[in-house]
């Protein structure tokens, strides 16, 4: 090839000048490359780009024609020549797309495709452009209008698309499958399994699909079935790029070396006729991209990321003279593409610049391009200036375009109607105490407001429209009007209920992470934030889940069940209904005032800060007691059983701090008593001079407490003034601190210390309060122990709490405490350290505690306030949920979860954000404990157990327990149905327009759970039919729908097989853990009320199996009549009948759909079902005899 006019020095190639390309620099090998590139908008100036006024292009020789900036400082992630118009498309790492028209690269359009993810591939179609990001496929017009936006699963990590025909698209990524999407219906039609995961490059010929894998392999797949026909193991490390032309396949990649992966300078070439490799081609650059450019011959273009480009024949030898250099503005080339006409090459670099190389002065991108549509030019050249300083200037001088349409000002008054002010919501106390006579309700006056006075601004309108700022309440209870606003993410979140309940509420809007939130509508759910804190303590999470005892209302067991649900959830909120149910039964909780009435919780009466601090002390004590009662070495077998006790527990090992209390009488008599505590309460100094105190000083004063009090002296035999001191013997692994900011005195102390600390920081770092940046030397001093760099001194406002503290036990039973950051700064400045060598710290009794969580009270007079938590989530949680290893602070506000800056966790504006609880953990805490979770639930929970009911007879048994040879296996079918009773009625209001608005849904409790065998000779026979004993007051038994009658749940008079909720819960948990598949009708609601999290692949719900999109759900009774010719649920519901019917419907579904292989024929059956339902108004015809099928043949297990 002729390369005349190029610099001869480019032909002199020195391997020493070109280091081995790091494999992590390649975007196909390491898709997270672009996420680690620092974006510097000021790094590239437009004036610095070399733009030549005239470019001399030699025919047949590629030379640079133009260079333009797509987005300053943002790396180019993909480039693509439009296949229909003379345009070049460029996607950036910031999710922005830009198009350039013609070889002059005139900017045509520019718009944002995705707010956070980079654009990974672009595909042009006739009517628009397809953009692929991590888990989103967006089809947009060339001007930027969205045609469709298809959201993939959050767990997907897509990298490549391939257009197989005009309406079918293949999408591949780092998963073990490739999706086929129909562009006409915008639906996923097929999911092809891939044996080797990681499909990042796809090509197509008239014979095969070619898939390039991150493992270094290239697979050839059938065009119809997508099955592997052949596979080339190209590279031992990873694949960088490959291309196919004719009967040749060329690939470049990385090979494994002793020091890791290295770029392989041998291109692998394969003959597709013989399906074998031919002589590899050695090149003189580090290949990162390659393309066939078949103009005259099948030559290859090989590109390195440093900008070197070499042309060679795939079956010949590479000549070092055939190398030219692209001059990128950034250090790396990120993309490369060739136009359809092979006349133009496009390169994108890491600084956002695009370089166009052509082989002719006037190239065309496509052989036959259609005309591009441009925007209409402005029809008005100029308008006369108007002097707005003239007050009498008539507005009619402003020219407006002529229009034939009616103007809004011409709207007739007859078609207008006044909008009256909405009626205020009825007071919750009135609704609670209201009695009804017919349709009229009456209630006593709650005396909460003056006569004939209604607030102008209604609370409900504030929730529905975010037009008014939330005004906070003073933390000290003062009556003045506060002036500070509450940030939106800290406000109390509420669930908006519709006629579909929670199904159409978008929880993803509040939580974009994969961590699970907690629902707030359950009574006493104010402790949600503390449940999250305990869950993200890794030793607590693991060790609590290993606990299982025989106590019915054990908080440790219920907390372990809740933690298990939080582990399984992938971003969906959970509810702690069973845990809070057990919590309400603890007498100590009621005695401490921890059980709130619904009206008190809704109105925010009482101090939530004091409440959560009492709850914190109670839960640690209760868990300590529950964990002391060790279970016998067998599975849970009912309500009875024996315990063996122990003096210590896992909670005690984690939280307990051994103390020594010394009482010294004035007579000289000294009494020493040992004790332990699970948490500490801050005790603030009485100093009113405004002295500066470190947090460590206040903490030490609170731990090593000294006070004068009257106490009994055995020597004096009377009460005497004594000096009581408290010394510490052993430091806990987790340091829990109650802040006790309950009055203006403590609030003023925090505010004063934060102001003093901020002034010291300003003075120390030589900046002013208005400065936003520091000098380099000062920025180094602001580096925290976790590597965080504070970019602005404004972030240190309202910060007094340190992120780390160091504690040391002295030889004279004393305790030294200091802020770790302060000591770190002193040592970095060369000052001597008082703690000794770091590697011998623990041997010397020195420990570092890192802040893990802060629980704060949000003061808001409009909503009554709320409790939120800032939690530092560790690497193990991110690895399990997000698939990444890093630490991050998050805000947990019930079901709202949002990542935050670490300084936000310690910024306490005492006007609305008051600290309540602090959690510090020892550094490297997880390495001190065995964190393996062993499922404590065994198969014996399914065996026969005694009933709690005293009057039950064996002749009335409605189920046969499983035998040992019938134990379920993975994939077995189990029919399930549950019946419920109502504990609290729904709270709703009727609006002025006649619509009903649900304020609070009814609280349901499970009353009966039935499981029937799904296969085998005893198919359809139940093996669980448990009635759940309840101690709570039942408002409505719902006998018409549940079949539950008063007395069925009372152990004294019930004749049913009565058991505890925990016993039946363990049976279902075992079935879920073993991997059975549940068949039922409306299982989503059943599992929600039972408080179980079941993987979606283990749920076969006939509600959705016999459902068409955007159509109504069909009842089990109608489905049974239509498909099975059965008439069920005649007088009441029976869970055995419903579970068996759901199993039969599932068998019918498999029969009609041919095991799911013929969806089209089954779709026709559903059409007929919906047509029949509309004709009959979805009502089953009444039988000739009013006797129900159940009365005609009563089911008896013993008769089978």
Swiss-Prot record:
WD repeats lie at residues 153-193, 195-231, 244-280, 328-367. GO terms for biological process: mRNA processing; nuclear-transcribed mRNA catabolic process; nuclear-transcribed mRNA poly(A) tail shortening; positive regulation of cytoplasmic mRNA processing body assembly. One of its GO terms (cellular component) is PAN complex. A divalent metal cation binds at residues 977, 979, 1086, 1138. Positively regulated by the regulatory subunit PAN3. Its EC number is 3.1.13.4. Residues 485-923 form the USP domain. The keyword Metal-binding applies. This is PAN2-PAN3 deadenylation complex catalytic subunit Pan2. It comes from Mus musculus (Mouse).
